[in-house]
Every structure is written in structure tokens, then in C-alpha cells.
């Protein structure tokens, strides 16, 4: 029977489910390639199937990634069941918790670029048709999403899941839930004589009771929530703990989903639109998530060729209330978010208030609004997640600053702030170690504005996280009385008066490089302003004496990184 016009049109628009792997499976000249693939398990009938890369950052160095080998196997089951052929490969992951506070932290942010690059290299070289990207640690999540955006193939992201809280029994007989951030704060308390060494040891032994990423709304959980809001992971998949076997189901369905995306011709950039990034920003703001989300969402948007800027964070943050009472400043952890319905609870509340774009496409092949209608998440419980009518703060948990000290911008986590204005006296340190020494010596006091510079993307290099110093400041009882400013960045576990991502950075001659001990600094959160209170002419004259220090690394990956990396104001991207 002849085809109707509609039938012919339908056939002509069916996507090629092997848009790339034909390069290695089809034709006489591909005999050698097929021979290699036969050696890893493929048979004649498999060469007609789409080849799906299962990219995993599994390793044995950190609990964040331990579940990924199990989940990768479930993903492969899903790919097989949907008619695809999975091929697993690995990439690196750096543990921020282990690399914090020493030279190793220089290598953390660059690992994001290495992950994205390595996934791109394998996907391009082997001509894989689509991917499921598995990650558990802070930089591996954005690294995988950057790769997906750059490649613009069918792709689904899958999170390893968070760790459950530990339970520490202290010397006074009390017990409390603890996360890794408690260890950093305990060090500061112990150094000031506010906690015994025995209690530090008890906390150390309890903070990581098993596998999974750090349990509060720190960077990994923030980015997992953002990935779900972007539409790049299955709805409801961000919150379940790593040990929860629901994750195996999400893994299998992720494998099935990527094959269906191939059949429908849906690629990552069809999902990663400007509106999708606005949804992710809104969810991060409502959760009071990590300031690292600013850096990472800018970088993912760059790879997706989406124009995203700090101004977008300011605009959205001013209209989205902060709803989640979660650590590091609140009482709850990600498993508590899971217990009350997960990320979809926040998304539905924001969608109902007109604060999300419900028509954004997701990896299910449906829109975000359609996904939420299908799973019918409950309303906020009022404890872990507040209703919009009763927010913790009327605006989002992250604020973008500008001013004479940050002409290109800076970022402050305002979730947990008690006041809007802080004015203090500059204590200037070139690097984190000098500031830690001063704190341990007791020379940092109430009213100080501690400036840690030459820690930016180029100057660090690597834009180290300052959790060692912020945790020590809080542990020393100075968390609400000392302002910390840096061209570096902060851990998702940071709380207190902390301004990071100051741009331009010191090594580029930004105003932070010109600060001197005794300068007065003013932070106005409500006004979104960060200023040095100095005579403008006198302050500008200091530029004549500025000379950047020599590079810390002249060989290796960081030497390359310094030559390529851009300002934190645009995501610290390379190219």
C-alpha cells in the first residue's frame, strides 16, 4: 500500500539511532575495528545497535564514588534492555575532602576540565552514539555535564547519591548527627581549646559511615539538584542516598532513557536551554545551595553555547525565596530532603508559583511540568522545606556582589546570614596557609576582614576552596564576627560571612591585589555591594607598585591551566 503524506513525513523524520558508531561497525574497511569490538563481547547482531558510552568516575579513593560500579552495571542492563550496546569507560575524580587545606587543592578545579576533556576524547575517538554519565564528587558532576553539553549527543546524567549522617558520641555523654563539615569545625574549636582532642577523634570516626557524597546541601548535592532541574537526570533521582537500592532502578531507567533519546533525536543542547539554566538557578537559590554552583552552571552553559551571566543569578535570586533548612547552615541533610519527597517537592512549589519554566524538555522526553504532573510530589513539609508563603529568607541563598573591590563580581552565600551589613578592618594574607597560622596564633579577632588573595583560577592556581580556614573560624567561635574575602572559592560546606570568586583576581591586578592591612571594607548584602572604603585616587595609585608574583607551577597540568583559564566571573572555563 502506498504511504500517505503523513506516514512518509514520519518515516523521514525518524532519527538515526547509530549516528556515529557506523564509523566503526559498517563496511569492509572496518573489519579491524569490528574485530576489536568482538574481543570485548560484541557479536554480529550487536553491530546494528547504538553504542552507548557509560562514563563513570568510580574510584576507591573517596566514599563519594564507591557506589558507581554497582550503578554502572545497572545502567548497562537498562541500555541492553532498550536495544543498545553499552561500553563502560572511566575518568578521574578528585576528593575535595581529602585534598582540602594543602597543595592538593590546587588540583581540584582543574579536574573538572580534565573530566570533561577525557569524556569528550573517548566519545569522539570511539564514535559512541550517546552516553550515560555517572558521578559522585564535587567536580565530577559539572565535568560530566560540561562534556554532555560540549558533545551535544543523547545523554543522561546519573548521581551516585549522598552519604547518610554519622552519629558521634562525645565525652560529655551526648550524641549528635555529624557530617564531614563537623570535622573541619572541630579542628578550629580544638585549636582554641573549645573542644577536646578526644571529641575531635569521635567526630572523625563517625562522619563517613559508608558510601556516598557529603550529606548536606554541599556542592555535590547542590549540583545533583541542579542537574535534575536542568532536565539532564531523571526526576526524583537526586535525593535518594547512595546505599538506597532505588538508585539501581534510576540507573536502569537512565540506560533505557538514553536509547529512547537517540530514537527521538533529542540531544543535550535540546535540553540545556537558557530557560533550563534559569530553572536550575532557581532551584539552587531555593535550596540555599553551594556558591560553587555559580561557577559550574556558568561553565556548563558555556559548553552548551548558552549566554548565562552573573546578572542572571542576581535577577533570579532576587525573586526566588530560600526555602530549605539544610546543612551547612540549617538542621537537615539530603536524606531528609529525600524523606519528604526530594527535589521535585521544591520544583513543584516553584512551578506553581510561576518561578520555573514548565515547558523545558527533559531526558524523559517530556517537559518538566509533565514530569511533575506524573509523579505528583507532595507539598513542602514545613520543616525541611518551607512553603513559599513562609520562607527562611525572601530571596535566594546566594547573592552576587559588585563594587569597588569586585568590579567584575563576587559571590556570597547569604543563607544563614543574620545581618545585611558588615564593616571591618582588612587583614591581608597572600595564600590560605598564612591566614590559618594567624588564626591558630589567636591574632585574628572580632571585626577583622580577612583577605586571602592570589588564590584565583590563575593565581592559585586552581581557585582553591577555603574550607580549612572557614571551618576553623567557625570552630573558633568567630563565624559571625569575622568577614572572609578571597579570589578563591569556598566549599559547599562553608557557612558564615564569606565572600568568594572576587574578580578580577589578584594576579590580574584586580582591586583585591591592592588592599593593605588596615583598609576598611564594607559588605552590604541587601545592596549587593562590596567596597573598599578608601580614597579612590589614593587606592588607584597603588596600581603603580603592583607586580604579580611568579607562577607557582611551570610544568605539568597547572602550568597549562594557567595559560587557558578565564575569570571566575565567567565560570573559570578554559577556551
Swiss-Prot record:
The gene is ilvD. The modification N6-carboxylysine is found at residue 139. Optimum pH is about 7.8. GO terms for biological process: branched-chain amino acid biosynthetic process; isoleucine biosynthetic process; L-valine biosynthetic process. Binds 1 [2Fe-2S] cluster per subunit. This cluster acts as a Lewis acid cofactor. Disruption phenotype: Cells lacking this gene display impaired growth. Is competitively inhibited by aspterric acid in vitro, which is thus a potential new lead compound for the design of novel anti-TB drugs. HAMAP family: IlvD. It catalyses: (2R)-2,3-dihydroxy-3-methylbutanoate = 3-methyl-2-oxobutanoate + H2O; (2R,3R)-2,3-dihydroxy-3-methylpentanoate = (S)-3-methyl-2-oxopentanoate + H2O. Its EC number is 4.2.1.9. [2Fe-2S] cluster binds at residues 64, 137, 214. Belongs to the IlvD/Edd family. PROSITE patterns: ILVD_EDD_1, ILVD_EDD_2. This is Dihydroxy-acid dehydratase. Homodimer. Mg(2+) binds at residues 96, 138-139, 465.
